[in-house]
């Protein structure tokens, strides 16, 4: 590891099939869509590239489509980064157009913290909402969020979540267990109850993951 935290703590290199395209779990492929992010978390397990380097970033959508077609066991795509929601609507639409046309895929996921850190990107972008609504009719779209503390549940987040739900998007949350932030039962229970009350499903907790 160097001062930038370049060490690949999750062994992603071993699961990379070609630039920016990973196949670790049998049914899921993952795309590193961008190195940019709406936030720069100290606990990020991709410090080696987020906000720094494009050398691992996905560039070949047609190759991804061909790979999926050649692997019938794949039933979903996770578009990650960085944060894919910092990309333009045109790029997001292109992803959805290509992947929603594949009969073998049951759903498409976006890993994003934008609804938490930049909710206006969603709530005030009617074009994006219409794109999501359009393609959700073809394939179920999930947003996998990262809300780590009740204080992150702002009125703006609630508005953005509501508009996503109106488009038919399913919202799941992955919480990072953080010392001194949410590592006690009261805070964690409050967080899970509050996100459930606004239609966001508690999905899983990141714990003891090397960063």
Regions found by a protein language model. Name each.
Residues 12-16, 40, 136, 166-167:
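Short, flexible segments with low predicted structural confidence
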Residues 23-57, 110:
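Canonical Radical SAM [4Fe-4S] cluster-binding loop centered on the CxxxCxxC motif
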Residues 31-32, 43-44, 76-85, 99:
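Conserved catalytic-core segments centered on acid/base and nucleophilic motifs
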Residues 25, 43-44, 61, 79, ...:
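Broad hydrophobic/π-residue packing in well-ordered secondary structure
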């Amino acid at each position: 590891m160097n001062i930038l935290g370049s060490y690949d703590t999750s062994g992603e290199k071993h699961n990379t099939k070609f630039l920016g395209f990973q196949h670790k779990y049998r049914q899921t492929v993952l795309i590193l869509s961008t190195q940019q992010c709406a936030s720069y978390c100290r606990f990020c397990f991709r410090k080696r590239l987020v906000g720094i380097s494009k050398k691992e970033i996905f560039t070949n959508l047609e190759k991804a489509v061909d790979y999926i077609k050649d692997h019938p066991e794949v039933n979903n795509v996770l578009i990650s980064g960085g944060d894919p929601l910092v990309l333009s609507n045109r790029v997001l639409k292109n992803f959805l157009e290509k992947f929603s046309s594949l009969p073998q895929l049951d759903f498409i996921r976006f890993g994003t913290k934008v609804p938490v850190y930049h909710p206006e990107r969603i709530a005030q972008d009617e074009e994006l909402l219409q794109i999501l609504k359009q393609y959700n009719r073809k394939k179920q779209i999930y947003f996998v969020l990262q809300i780590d503390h009740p204080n992150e549940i702002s009125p703006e987040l609630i508005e953005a979540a509501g508009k996503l739900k109106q488009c038919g998007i399913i919202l799941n949350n992955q919480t990072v267990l953080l010392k001194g932030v949410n590592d006690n039962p009261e805070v964690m229970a409050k967080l899970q109850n509050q996100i459930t009350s606004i239609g966001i499903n508690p999905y899983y907790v990141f714990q003891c993951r090397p960063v």
